[in-house]
């Protein structure tokens, strides 16, 4: 390949990279891999992307650059052949509470334009299309009748401001008009005036003289009261195709629109069938707003619901608080506020009044129809005829409570049931009601965004349009359907377009970001992705690879930091950074095309292993190292059972979770795994243990050996500390022993230094210039804040005299800069231990740091800022903390995709750590897609079969072998394929 076809990186030194030279082929699909902490992200993001971004910013004007902050040059000699770089990371795209999947992918913007262009406004009264009429519409109407059919062109009588009806009629006579239509009878204007002047009555209450004297407003009022209409006869004609007759009809129609203030009526004789036309956008007495793209924008005041301002929710009475257990019936007391002797009277009265309507008082709330729920909340049909204070419904109950909130007990009650609830006006659609009148194919835009992406794609495929509509919407429909297909291809078909962006996982956000970039069709760029397979079931990985290939085939270079075996094998080129993590990594241990490591030839594999002996990736890809499949599984007899789980898409399932074993919850994205474990099990267990927790999702309860569990821990990937000074040593309590050790040294005793002097969280020994952080942040107003090394302590965090205290030739700063592996070796060295105090402290330090080594984090520094740790590293630090805990009370540990960011080699270590926890009498529940972890489980709970509304069922539960035998289980299918290969 020619030299200019490579992106060439020379001397990369970011973080732990060891001055490496890397060539990345342009226009190819490239995977960067290696163990956790080896330097993959340093190469991909801190070097490649950082330089691409810096060059882009440098090309902008100085005015634009001041808003983008300072971009420092990455630590490398040079980078050649680098195209514009785009990074797609595992971050939630937007924290804006209005941002949705639809707006993030730009599909909603195209939908808005589509509805503005070809949407038909439908009257909610008659169901007829609302449109502005022209004279052409009147001509078309006459052509429905046979030649010679007589008709009259009429204009509603309109009084000009400042005139009476009498003067208006006289003006019509002067203009040459002779007749009007009153009560479906034609009458000469002079005859009508004579009748009126003679005192003839129009109705028992209104005389015709009153009518003649009426001005514009009074005339309209009298017309409404009497139900009468008066029309001016503009012309009389008959259906004809003669050119002159058509010309006359068009002129008369124009005149009728003018005289009738935009309205006109065509009356056919003798049938007296009437057709109304209007140049205004109105029908059935209503004036409608003409569709525009802003009409469908909930981010614009022109389209947003005025009540909730486009959020879709307001603070009000929360249905989930009023009816927390939807499996109860009305009779059994599902309405919590109607319990007790006093408030129970409301329940008794509702049951009594509901009897004539056959209201199902014994049916569980979740089985009630929407109409029945409306009766319970807003009142039975008969309630409308009663006085407000005599009505019985949940709404009326809370109206009564609000009226009495001057009493403390009612104020407390109101606060108990207040929360974020669906907007009562827009019902959560976020748009003003006028937007719902506009339809395409019988559906409003709010109905479309509530469909799953899978169903929405099918709907667009079946959509029937006229030739004109197809022509107008061709490009819009292409953009919408392409983007929907991209979302389906990355396994997000279960989402809806109105799903809030801030409720998505990092993996879902990244894949949505990926589809947005695919939709933009940029070419000649380098896309850098951080583990796009996170959160993806094996079923969806092939589709993700197809999407990445499409991105590459547009003319882009696609670089993925990835650990998934399928993606590594699908790549054109593999770059392996290693061999280990931290200071033991940062080297290029393999770089080559897929054909090299995909070979099944044993001799070729052996040569490859000899050529690249330090590459763990090559060892695993050639199956010379592997994660062993257990030959047996732990037996269990105790369990926790979740009964009737129906949170989100769960279908009222009962699920048993065995105790003292390794349980893995599997299923495609959106099948209900997180709802079951994070949404129900974790908060329900915390509440059972009398701990503070969010309200668990909808379920009947927990049964089984719940009391066997004394603690419950959710080990997530959030940062380990809230303080910017937190680090692994402080989190694992090893730093307490380190401080005691230094305070026990002779110089410390002489100077009066207590353990507090060696803390960077307390005054005394820390540098007060930077408050123990080692750096200072300088605010730059319009530019990005500058983070600079503290000049007082030179980044060492402590005062100079504290650094004079040494143990084994090392001061406190030297110890904080040690890796975990170095620290264990240093503190275990008996040569440094001079007294019993030193021995005891060192034993504690080593015992608390050892679990970090066991979970594969021996490369991180003791004083490493917690904000610099990856999600996977944070999770393993927490795991190490629990492994190191000395109490042995049975604990239920819950992990959500712990293999995120982990290489095969790291997963092997992680499984050893999991087994260590189980051997101590603990129980593990893990949500996972990684097949190497799933095959090692003692028990698998597989949800599905699909995501979204096609998920939420328990497909199969049992050992891996039992799951593999289930033909309905996608997890079982891929597990079988994995074990057959190996």
What are these language model-derived features?
Residues 1-982:
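Conserved phosphate-binding elements of NTP-dependent enzyme cores
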